A protein has these predicted regions:
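Pocket-lining segment of extracytoplasmic ligand-binding domains
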Residues: 75, 150, 157-245
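Sec-dependent N-terminal signal peptides of Gram-positive bacterial secreted proteins and lipoproteins
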Residues: 1-2
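Solvent-exposed, polar/charged alpha-helical surfaces in well-ordered, non-transmembrane soluble domains
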Residues: 29-32, 37-38, 60, 64, ...
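Secondary-structure end/capping motifs
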Residues: 212-289
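Conserved C-terminal helix/tail region of periplasmic/extracytoplasmic solute-binding proteins
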Residues: 283-314
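Short acidic capping loops at alpha-helix termini that bridge into adjacent secondary structure
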Residues: 115, 145-149, 252
Length: 314
């Protein structure tokens, strides 16, 4: 049963799909490329892209019916899956050595070693994977969370101001944004995600009802995204130009972001284990408000139809 609104485009019928994407981590370039190159239209999809600051904001857009699909890094995803009837329909990025090394711990000049973090104010964008990163990093360095203060912020600009005026002493940053922090007097690198023993993956999610009522639409959306991924991989400079057009990101900075992203489509046993391990940690820390089974929140039917070989999760 297809319930989507349909429109005629160049005499061809297309289905409107509202895709919420982020402007922060990697900038959702595979979505932007798929739209710009006409891949959605080719697959019968009239994509309406809407920009949000972080993945968590796209999840809220799905929960409040502003969007059909959203995307989120593992941590925000797990915290959100119990809030509404949403399902994971594919992995979008997998953390690798390159992306882990790119995500750096930047600190004020008086912090020379991990131990100097004690008594300091650590910046954390609320509800994002950085909460997990800090916890893992501090545990790895044997620093008690009681000995530090977390300072929440909601946008990178807020964090930059915080670092400048002394409200924040240390922060995690990656990609193009990193240079903005490094340009602040006395800010240096102390470590990276690899030293925290953490990888960050991100996922595509949607309302369960949308997925169940529109299987073909979801399948075609995934096909268009796959072409978007291939385009970005093979046309990094052109994608960087697109980033400048749409996000006003300087091309050389966007290029850095694109080079470190490991865009994928698929869902493997490893993807599921990554989420399950993090979910257990959240439960043990008492951070997961809603009870649910991960397996009930995964719907890979469309992905299996579009790219059967990309799914190894049973």
């Amino acid at each position: 049963m297809e319930v989507r609104e349909r429109t005629k485009s160049n005499g061809k019928e297309t289905t409107i799909v509202k895709l919420a994407i982020d402007t922060a981590a990697g900038g959702s370039f595979q979505f932007r490329a798929a739209e710009k190159q006409g891949y959605f239209e080719k697959n019968g999809i009239k994509a309406q892209l809407s920009n949000f600051a972080y993945g968590i904001d796209t999840v809220n857009a799905v929960l409040t019916e502003q969007a059909d699909t959203g995307l989120a890094a593992d941590y925000a995803l797990l915290n959100s899956l119990g809030k509404g009837d949403m399902v994971v329909i594919s992995t979008l990025t997998r953390g690798n050595e390159k992306s882990s090394k790119d995500n750096e711990l930047l600190v004020k000049e008086e912090i020379k070693t991990e131990n100097d973090l004690k008594g300091k104010k650590l910046g954390v964008p609320k509800g994002t994977v950085t909460e997990y990163v800090w916890a893992k990093y501090l545990a790895a360095k044997h620093i008690n969370e009681k000995d530090i203060t977390f300072v929440p912020y909601s946008t990178p600009d807020e964090a930059i101001v915080g670092m400048k005026n002394g409200d924040i002493d240390a922060i995690w940053s990656s990609g193009a944004l990193k240079d903005k922090f490094k340009n602040i007097k006395g800010v240096t690198k102390l470590g990276d995600l690899e030293s925290a023993g953490v990888t960050i993956d991100s996922y595509l999610l949607a309302k369960r009802s949308f997925v169940e009522k529109n299987p073909k639409v979801v399948e075609n959306t995934l096909k268009a995204l796959s072409e978007g991924v291939k385009y970005v991989d093979n046309n990094k400079k052109e994608t960087a130009k697109l980033a400048f057009e749409q996000l006003k990101l300087p091309e050389k900075d966007a290029l850095k972001d694109i080079e470190r992203q490991n865009y994928v489509l698929g869902f493997t046993e490893e993807d599921a284990k990554h989420l399950e391990d993090m979910k257990v940690w959240l439960e043990e820390k008492g951070k997961l408000k809603d009870k649910y089974e991960l397996k009930d929140k995964i719907n890979l039917e469309a992905l299996k139809k579009a790219f059967p070989e990309s799914v190894t999760y049973k």
